[in-house]
Amino acid sequence: MTAANKNIVFGFSRSISAILLICFFFEKVCGDMEHDMGMDDTSGYTRPEIVQAGSKSFHWLCTLGFLLLLPSVVTCLSFAGRIYSATLLQCTCAVYAFLEAAVLRFQDNDGVENRTSRGTAWFLVGLTWITLFFGGLAGGTGFLVKSKRLQTFISNAGEKRLSYIHRGLSFLTVLTGWVKVCLAPVALFGFCREAHTGQCIAHGIMGSAFVLYGFIYVLVLVIPWIRSAQTSYSQDYVDSWVMCIWGVVNTFTEHRWGREGWSVHDYQHTFMGIIWWTGGILGIFLSRNGRRTFVPSLIIIFTGWAMSEHAQHLIISTKVHNMFGLVLMCGGALRIIEISFLLRDKRTLDKIHSFQYLAPFCLVCSGLLFMGANEEQLILVLRLGGDHSAYVLIIVSGAFLVYFWMIACLEFYLYLLEKGKQGFLPKSYELEEENNNVSFELDNISNEDVDEDTTPFNV
């Protein structure tokens, strides 16, 4: 078969696959529209009285800026080797983290902040100051280096190892800041207490996991040496292992085997764990020796379908879960198209196509939708007079901003590395200075030669 015929066959198969996927999702959306489109009865709900909304909103924005956004910039600086700049900005984060834990409070209308939010605040204080300490050691801060014990510790550990520790701790502060920012509204509205605690934990962990999964996808996509790394294993191989392990844990923790009866919830989540570890085994086998495979993406599609079919107590909750499942299925399907048809089972291409940014965004968006799909939050939406469409739009708007911040941080990191290669001064100025130095050295040599020639010769 000639190259032209191969391209024709490949293009035809790609078109057929795309048409089938479009038909599948069109049928899914139309099928959902045929369901009961009624609304929840809100006659029993009263509009909530939010006390000091302005000051609480400003407090949350400050927490967002100093405990999540600024630490993200610090992490970029740390990974780019700018330890001094990272440590300087980290001082600001550490001071605010202490004020957040010691003075400021995310209190509900009863003046109470839950223990999880309070404990996270104090944990973040300790973590930020420890990170700042290691940053000072790695950067050679004066008052720290004066101590003989610290000098011995630095010499034994090595500056390179200390910088690695600082990078890891800096990234951990970003993750903890994400938890704190997400817990703040929970504390302000008094959510996730008593019987609702388990549901909030499940939605928070699973939703954040999808957001982190999307970040890893875009990290591999944007950073060129990770994208083009010639390793013995592919990204699908790692994904399959993670899904397999997570599936095993989920299978044996969602139900007390032999100690209680089975409920619909147990069936749903336990069998979801089973499909994760069984699919993970197949994915591990097919992706061995560095090969690509569709299995992790297919597992995501089935997970999205299962979540979209979960019936909830509230109609708005059912519709939000349905949207979450639909977006998750889109992410898995787009990933299959990328691997099988765009990359053609290769690791990477010469350049990044705009299409490749879509699958990670779907994962980030689905994660935020799942985090916002717990029952108490949706009851608050009903009490405020909103519906599922407005709620989904505001969450997707947040997903756009989160995804923008992820890509912006990665691009900022690459910019710092590029500036580091060029040097502090502009390249033209450096070349000019180098030429001046060379000419100055030549002048010195010529002057020395003249002096030697004019030296009197004594017989």
From Swiss-Prot:
The Gene Ontology CC terms held by the record are: membrane
InterPro entries, alphabetically? YTP1_C (IPR018827)
Topology of this chain in the membrane: Multi-pass membrane protein
Q: Where in the cell is it found?
A: Membrane
Bilayer-crossing regions:
7-27, 60-80, 83-103, 123-143, 171-191, 206-226, 267-287, 296-316, 323-343, 352-372, 390-410
Cytoplasmic domain ranges by topology? 28-59, 104-122, 192-205, 288-295, 344-351, 411-459
According to the UniProt topology, which residue ranges lie Extracellular?
1-6, 81-82, 144-170, 227-266, 317-322, 373-389
Q: Which UniProt keywords apply?
A: Membrane, Transmembrane, Transmembrane helix
Stated name of the protein: Protein YTP1
Q: Which organism is it from?
A: Saccharomyces cerevisiae (strain ATCC 204508 / S288c)
Supply the gene name: YTP1
